[in-house]
Swiss-Prot record:
Protein name: GTPase Der
UniProt: GTP 2 binding residues: 209-216, 256-260, 321-324
Subunit structure: Associates with the 50S ribosomal subunit.
PROSITE patterns in the record: G_ENGA
Molecular function GO labels: GTP binding; ribosome binding
Length: 490
């Protein structure tokens, strides 16, 4: 399970500042869903290789009606979704009645809660936080989010130990044990070829999308066609069900974010679009099916969700549902809109289906397997270096400060998604346009479909950096004569 951390507190206590500080470690694309979650933002963050989802909530006023006000509904829902809460207060403003109301509500929820006193820059932290002990939430962690002061300590001494208790490292790195063998390449870490085979693992497939686009119908259609579901295996992600299934001799784990197998237990809150549930399913999947309603077209919510999928590095299959019943003219308009708004992800297969009637559903799994195989295929260093060399020959890197950027060699840096590491000189100065050129060149050369490909650049080390030049005996004698001449001239 990917842990969820919610930032709550009064308005203007620095929640958004801390949110930006936390998610910046992964340069995360914030999944902001307009309208549906007006005052909540979602982003991915990382601490020592352990990922978590961070929620930035709107301020809770704590008016005369208490904390349970309609203005705070979204923030209260974020508290329910979260595994841990960072309750933020303003050290400069001191203890306020709204802080007491929020603390009372948090105590009633019995959620792991840590009290964070922000804006302690320029203050004596010990004196600034004294009043907040009256909230009865235990130790107080002073920070200055705008400057980053105390944030690392907060992560290391609060979130990291809590995450260790929530999910031991061996559980978090469950898949890493498999992928570690994949990454050992020409560096003395040779492994037996048959020790690891990605084809032997079930493909984790998540079906995600906005409400009422047909996720449940598609899930039922897939399961109804196969009828080989052995049992429902409840997942660690809340309100999601992990359903083992088999198709064409290949094992899958269908991550159902619609709760289709427990429909009788679904509450009104679950029927709404649960952002957290969807984000956790994406994080846990190998391949994601993004379902879009053909009648409504691409919405901002679809693009936000798509951005999170790409930022997570997951393989992608786009499914345009409710294709039946549309006139040919409307179909052409929908395709033109898709080409225009989704032109930046030309690597993903697009399928036009009717989940209700089953047309086109059978072709989805061919693209799912293709995407998974592309993301897990092993490529040697010699092949990657050869592709890089051909790319440079076709289009040389630009000049930077009068010198040509030099690319030396490339090797694999990871899989799922495929990562290519390029070593060279001045590679940090490469413009984004050339980086995109290299990424597209590698994708076409490797025939990668359905999976994003990432390129990382590493600067070659200067062997003479931080080393003083050692003069030869002849140079030493010349230097002495020169120094004598300078002294006589004075």
């Amino acid at each position: 399970m990917v842990p969820v951390v919610a930032l709550v507190g009064r308005p203007n206590v620095g929640k958004s500042t801390l949110f930006n500080r936390l998610t910046r470690t992964r340069d995360a694309l914030v999944a902001d869903f307009p309208g549906l979650t007006r005052d909540r933002k979602y982003g991915r963050a990382e601490i020592e290789g352990r990922e978590f989802i961070c929620i930035d909530t709107g301020g809770i006023d704590g008016t005369e009606d208490g904390v349970e006000t309609r203005m705070a509904e979204q923030s209260l829902l974020a508290i329910e979704e979260a595994d841990v809460v960072l309750f933020m207060v303003d050290a400069r403003s001191g203890l306020m009645p709204a802080d007491e109301a929020i603390a009372k509500h948090l105590r009633s929820r019995e959620k792991p809660t840590f009290l964070v006193a922000n804006k302690t820059d320029g203050l004596d932290p010990d004196q600034a936080v004294v009043d907040f002990y009256a909230l009865g939430l235990g130790e107080i962690y002073p920070i200055a989010a705008s400057h980053g002061r105390g944030v690392l300590s907060l992560l290391e001494h609060v979130l990291l130990p809590w995450m260790e208790d929530l999910a031991p490292q061996e559980e978090v790195d469950e898949d890493a044990e498999y992928w570690a063998q994949f990454e050992a390449e020409e560096n003395g870490e040779e492994e037996e070829e048959d020790d690891f085979d990605p084809q032997s693992l079930p493909i984790k497939l998540a079906i995600v999308g906005r409400p009422n686009v047909g996720k449940s119908t598609l899930t039922n259609r897939i399961l109804g066609e196969e009828r080989v579901v052995v049992y429902d295996m409840p997942g660690t992600t809340r309100d999601s069900i992990y359903i083992p299934m088999e198709r064409d001799g290949r094992e899958y784990v269908l991550i159902d974010t619609a709760g289709v197998r427990k429909r009788g237990k679904i509450t009104d809150a679950v029927e709404k679009f649960s952002v957290i549930k969807t984000l956790q399913a994406i994080e846990d999947a190998n391949v994601v099916m993004l379902v879009i309603d053909a009648r409504e077209g691409i919405s901002d919510q679809d693009l936000s969700l798509l951005g999170f999928i790409l930022n997570s590095g997951r393989s992608l299959v786009i499914v345009v549902n409710k294709w039946d019943g549309l006139s040919q003219e409307v179909k052409e308009q929908v395709k033109e809109t898709l080409d225009f708004r989704l032109g930046f992800i030309d690597f993903a297969r697009v399928h036009f289906i009717s989940a209700l009637h089953g047309s086109g559903v059978g072709n989805l799994f061919e693209s799912v397997r293709e995407a998974y195989d592309s993301s897990t295929r092993r490529v040697g260093t010699s092949m990657l270096t050869r592709i890089m060399t051909m790319a440079v020959e076709d289009h040389q890197p630009p000049l930077v400060r009068g010198r040509r950027v030099k690319l030396k060699y490339a090797h694999a840096g990871g899989y799922n998604p495929p990562i290519v590491v390029i070593h060279g000189n001045q590679v940090k100065d490469l413009p984004d346009s050339y980086k995109r050129y290299l990424m597209n060149y590698f994708r076409k050369s490797l025939d990668v479909m359905g999976s994003p490909i990432r390129i990382q650049f590493k600067e070659g080390e200067n062997p003479y950096a931080n080393k003083r030049n050692t003069l030869t005996p002849t140079q030493m004698r010349k230097r002495k004569r020169l120094m004598k001449h300078i002294k006589k001239s004075k």
